[in-house]
Regions:
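C-terminal functional extensions of proteins
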Residues: 27-147
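Cofactor-cradling patches in redox/metallo enzymes
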Residues: 21-25
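Generic beta-sheet signal
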Residues: 15-17, 52
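A short helix->loop->beta-strand "cap" motif at the edges of active sites that frequently abuts
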Residues: 7-12, 110
């Protein structure tokens, strides 16, 4: 895959997960996701990184709070109706991002685009309309960089 990306003339976009479940990416921040990709051969190949944040990122405020109900922090009151077969036992965590992470990612080359991407009905899924709008913005950026 990395060789195909390297051979391509197209721009690349990494869409960071909203939440992760137990496994290889358990507990990773958005920055750590990007660094893992770079460590596996994509260094210098990522043009854009799309991350979810429910609030504007500022130097002193990490984005938190949207996933309280699905992280197990409030599992007594959380609804499982929109989580399909997932069990609320702390096995789902948000992929966190903060201002410093965005700065660190951009220092390595990619442009970071931070948007509220969560599906209001399925809080661990990306909202298709929000993704569409973000992708349209990336396409505009790609065209403007070519000029």
């Amino acid at each position: 895959v990395v060789d195909a990306i390297r051979a391509s003339k197209g721009s690349t976009l990494f869409v960071c997960s909203l939440a992760d479940m137990q496994g290889e990416t358990w507990g990773l921040t958005a920055r750590e996701h990007v660094e893992a990709l770079m460590d596996h051969g994509t260094r210098g190949l990522l043009d854009y990184v799309l991350v979810h944040t429910p609030v504007s990122l500022r130097p002193d405020s990490p984005a938190t709070g949207v996933f309280t109900a699905v992280t197990g922090a409030d599992s007594e009151h959380a609804s499982t109706a929109d989580l399909d077969d997932l069990v609320l036992s702390g096995r789902i965590r948000p992929v966190r991002v903060c201002y410093q992470d965005v700065q660190a990612i951009q220092a390595q080359g990619p442009v970071v685009i931070a948007r509220n991407l969560v599906d209001p009905i399925h809080p661990t899924w990306h909202d298709p309309a929000a993704l569409r709008d973000a992708f349209a913005g990336v396409l505009k950026l790609c065209r403007s960089r070519r000029r």
